[in-house]
């Protein structure tokens, strides 16, 4: 079964909201000492929508539910410290990293309740910048929503006998997504030279992501009663997954997860001031940004890591 996104609904006002949300987060994110302030200046969703195939529909993994119970206290405290509330935003974005370490006991495998293709140990991912401060937030607030339309109906997971149907049942979608995107994201920053004194020299940098190719499996779990949506991607295609999601077998050494999910990322770079000498399309800089993007996907969304959207009240 295929799922269609109403891509025309992603207009400029939604892009502006996303830019504002990104810049709010970037302004409070730690950066390496050699990187100046980072600002997103433009964003365009592009004209190409992803090709989404529904591979499987099942009950939600208990790992999502158990992690939610541990995250409740952290989540409530985070909302108190923020100027944003559920009444002002459509949903709240909470990183799993805010509650890491509060899961199952040390001597109990975290994967014992999961199907075979999801049984991977819970671990702490490596930092993409190694010895430099992390550029990842522990909590983000996002105030945008994406219109969704399902082409063909599908039966929800099993409902126990003798119970009234839940208007918002828990269900989990396994999707195979192929997206040859022509989105465009432009940001500016600067390279700081801190010798012989701090900020002795600043070199402007302009980076533009002009497109990417995403090809992989994504798990989307909807927790109806709590109105939460969990996102993650399996670390590897497995024999237990349906053939449509397994993809083409690879010969030789497997590719890194980030490169498998994002085999192509197109980036344009400019270093220097526009009215003076400018270096364009610097290969090393572009490769560095590609590595950062892929590493971020690995550390934020590849199991055992996942993200959760806390939806606002539906009013019903």
Curated annotation (Swiss-Prot):
One of its GO terms (cellular component) is ERMES complex. GO terms for biological process: mitochondrial genome maintenance; mitochondrion-endoplasmic reticulum membrane tethering; phospholipid transport; protein insertion into mitochondrial outer membrane. It comes from the Eukaryota. Residues 1-312 form the SMP-LTD domain. InterPro entries: Mdm12 (IPR027532), MMM1_dom (IPR019411), SMP_LBD (IPR031468). PROSITE patterns: SMP (PS51847). One of its GO terms (molecular function) is lipid binding. It is found in: Mitochondrion outer membrane; Endoplasmic reticulum membrane. It is a peripheral membrane protein. Keywords: Endoplasmic reticulum, Lipid transport, Lipid-binding, Membrane, Mitochondrion, Mitochondrion outer membrane, Transport. The SMP-LTD domain is a barrel-like domain that can bind various types of glycerophospholipids in its interior and mediate their transfer between two adjacent bilayers. Belongs to the MDM12 family. Component of the ERMES/MDM complex, which serves as a molecular tether to connect the endoplasmic reticulum (ER) and mitochondria. Components of this complex are involved in the control of mitochondrial shape and protein biogenesis, and function in nonvesicular lipid trafficking between the ER and mitochondria. MDM12 is required for the interaction of the ER-resident membrane protein MMM1 and the outer mitochondrial membrane-resident beta-barrel protein MDM10. Component of the ER-mitochondria encounter structure (ERMES) or MDM complex, composed of MMM1, MDM10, MDM12 and MDM34. A MMM1 homodimer associates with one molecule of MDM12 on each side in a pairwise head-to-tail manner, and the SMP-LTD domains of MMM1 and MDM12 generate a continuous hydrophobic tunnel for phospholipid trafficking. This is Mitochondrial distribution and morphology protein 12. It comes from Postia placenta (strain ATCC 44394 / Madison 698-R) (Brown rot fungus).
């Amino acid at each position: 079964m295929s799922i269609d996104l109403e891509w025309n609904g992603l207009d400029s006002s939604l892009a502006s909201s996303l830019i504002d949300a990104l810049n709010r987060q970037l302004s409070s994110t730690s950066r390496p000492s050699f990187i100046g302030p980072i600002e997103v200046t433009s964003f365009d969703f592009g004209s190409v929508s992803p090709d989404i195939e529904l591979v499987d529909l099942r009950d939600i993994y208990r790992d999502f539910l158990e992690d939610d119970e541990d995250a409740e206290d952290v989540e409530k405290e985070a909302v108190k410290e923020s100027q944003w509330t559920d009444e002002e935003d459509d949903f709240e974005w909470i990183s799993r990293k805010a509650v890491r370490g509060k899961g199952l006991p040390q001597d109990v495998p975290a994967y014992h309740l999961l199907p075979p293709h999801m049984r991977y140990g819970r671990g702490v991912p490596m930092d993409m910048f190694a010895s430099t401060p992390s550029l990842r937030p522990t909590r983000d607030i996002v105030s945008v929503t994406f219109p969704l339309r399902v082409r063909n109906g599908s039966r929800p997971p099993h409902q126990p006998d003798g119970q009234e149907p839940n208007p918002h049942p828990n269900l989990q979608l396994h999707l195979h997504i192929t997206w040859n995107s022509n989105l465009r994201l432009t940001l500016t920053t600067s390279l700081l030279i801190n010798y012989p004194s701090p900020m002795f020299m600043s070199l402007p940098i302009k980076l533009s992501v002009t497109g990417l190719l995403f090809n992989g499996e994504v798990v989307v779990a909807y927790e109806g009663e709590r109105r939460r949506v969990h996102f993650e991607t399996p670390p590897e295609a497995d024999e237990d997954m349906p053939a449509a999601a397994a993809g083409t077998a690879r010969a030789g050494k497997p590719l890194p997860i980030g490169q498998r999910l994002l085999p192509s990322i197109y980036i344009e770079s400019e270093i220097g001031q526009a009215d003076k000498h400018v270096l364009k399309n610097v290969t090393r800089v572009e490769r560095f940004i590609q590595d950062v993007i892929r590493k971020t996907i690995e550390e934020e969304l590849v199991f055992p890591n996942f993200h959760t959207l806390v939806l606002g009240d539906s009013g019903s």
